[in-house]
């Protein structure tokens, strides 16, 4: 038996729209939907995809994020130093206040315009941008440091355009990681009332409680106690939002198993516009739900799979 050896089947925004309209009988074989019809269907397709976030959509939308140390504040927006990737190094020689050229252990992967955070001797974090990287062991920053920075103090950097997080839909599995010792301790994720009931939210120490507010635009993390220096980073797992269908050739932000559910679901939503009867539309909704359930069943749930031997006695 000959098979293709190929696994890269995909579809696109406009192909899904055309297939949905064909499924409805709104267009015939070989016909092209009108531009206005495509625009309206694309809008509904985006709404449908966004609504799927209610299922949590595990696995492919599950990512790891990091809150870099920030000081003198109890909360941080996801538009700030909350990232999916970062690098760290240390100051390699004592630096005086007002310096812009800093000696670091390794600046190899730094680049101009990257965000950089330097731990000051008073425990605060000084965030600015990188102006240039003269060599592999120094960096020039845009805003001079406002305190002394001793050798061994931590330095964090990341590329804002690539590494800043998209607003998480859900956040869970939080740990406080010591950047130097590379050890982690669990953080208790609390609700809104539990966090705001805390008496002294300006106290500093090892963060052990976090409340995440997924407000519109950018989410906000509230931490307790506040970071006391730059030694630790908060790690967490999160479900990111689904990507939009912006252009005709945009592919779905989901595995292949969900393509059919997406197409039939769009057909069900568009049904009334094209004169589909209530009974037929109900059938489309049933089909769409069935295909989506089957697709979800094919995706492993979050968590671990444990394998163990069968120790039952076997007769030869």
Predicted ranges, named:
Residues 99-105:
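Short alpha-helix capping/helix-loop boundary micro-motifs
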Residues 1-96, 108-316:
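Glycine-enriched, solvent-exposed interface loops adjoining structured elements
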């Amino acid at each position: 038996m000959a098979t293709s050896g190929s696994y890269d089947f995909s579809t696109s925004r406009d192909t899904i729209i055309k297939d949905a309209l064909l499924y409805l009988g709104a267009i015939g074989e070989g016909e092209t939907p009108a531009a206005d019809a495509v625009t309206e269907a694309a809008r509904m397709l985006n709404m449908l995809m966004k609504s799927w976030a209610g299922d949590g959509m595990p696995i492919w939308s599950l990512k790891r994020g990091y809150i870099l140390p920030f000081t003198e504040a109890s909360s941080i927006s996801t538009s700030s130093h909350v990232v999916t990737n970062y690098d760290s190094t240390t100051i390699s020689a004592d630096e005086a206040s007002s310096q812009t050229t800093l000696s670091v252990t390794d600046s190899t992967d730094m680049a101009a315009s990257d965000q950089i955070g330097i731990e000051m001797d008073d425990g605060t974090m000084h965030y600015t941008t990188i102006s240039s990287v003269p060599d592999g062991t120094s960096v020039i920053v845009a805003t001079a440091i406002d305190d002394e920075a001793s050798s061994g103090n931590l330095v964090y950097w990341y590329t804002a355009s690539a590494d800043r997080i998209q607003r998480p839909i859900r956040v869970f599995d939080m740990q406080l990681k010591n950047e130097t010792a590379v050890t982690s301790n669990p953080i208790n994720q609390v609700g809104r009332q539990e966090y705001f009931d805390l008496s002294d939210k300006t106290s500093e120490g090892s963060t052990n409680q976090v409340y995440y507010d997924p407000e519109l635009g950018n989410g906000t993390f509230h931490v307790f106690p506040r970071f006391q220096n730059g030694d630790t980073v908060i790690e967490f797992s999160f479900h990111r939002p689904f990507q939009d269908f912006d252009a005709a050739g945009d592919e779905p932000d989901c595995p292949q198993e969900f393509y059919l559910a997406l197409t039939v679901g769009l057909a069900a939503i568009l049904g009334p516009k094209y004169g589909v009867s209530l009974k037929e539309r109900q059938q489309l909704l049933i089909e769409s739900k069935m295909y989506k359930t089957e697709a979800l069943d094919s995706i492993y749930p979050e968590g671990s799979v444990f394998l163990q031997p069968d120790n039952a006695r076997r007769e030869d």
